[in-house]
Amino acid sequence: MIRRSIVSFPTMKLKQLESYLSQVAPFENPQYELEQYPTSAHLASRMIFTAANSFEDIVDKHVLDLGTGTAMLGIASVIMGAGHVLGIDVDPGALATAAENLRVVEAEEEMELLHSNVEHISLRPGSFDTVVMNPPFGTRTSGADTMFLNKAFEVATHAVYSMHKSSTREFVLAQGASKGFRGEVDLVRFERIEPLPTDEKEEEKSEAIVF
């Protein structure tokens, strides 16, 4: 089990993180219309490890896991030293699994879960340092990916880590630019340029964009 008190974040190895994340249970009943494709421990560990060590976007940060599902990215953020994590999802079944995952890895104090629709939730602009997410591709509900991106750009003060189909790369980067974020195709990371005033989703078909 994972306890922050016994995990040494500065010396955490990538393979260690992936091993911890292998404890995270996947969706019990994936909702096709919500495009609930699982985020593998392999991919999640690489995204959050990079965010923490290459960009300093996780340790002691206020992190939002948008569309958290079973909390894979949120738990990874906790393990890597996030100050606090909020996970939001519209599916109560997924949140029940997420809550059990938090119990299993003993991360209930560090991560909070909220049942809400991303489109309608009211979050104060700039209320999170970093947003991490594996959003819908928008293949079932047109514009779903844009909705998640817009909410992420609205609430992140510094960086957004998001997974998308490589075929939508230019569109996603343009979305970030329109909101004042510069994106890098990496894993993808978006960094704010100016301060505020069934696994269809395979790794070979997706890439992490960092803003």
Show which residues each predicted segment covers.
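Class I S-adenosyl-L-methionine-dependent methyltransferase catalytic core
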Residues: 2-211
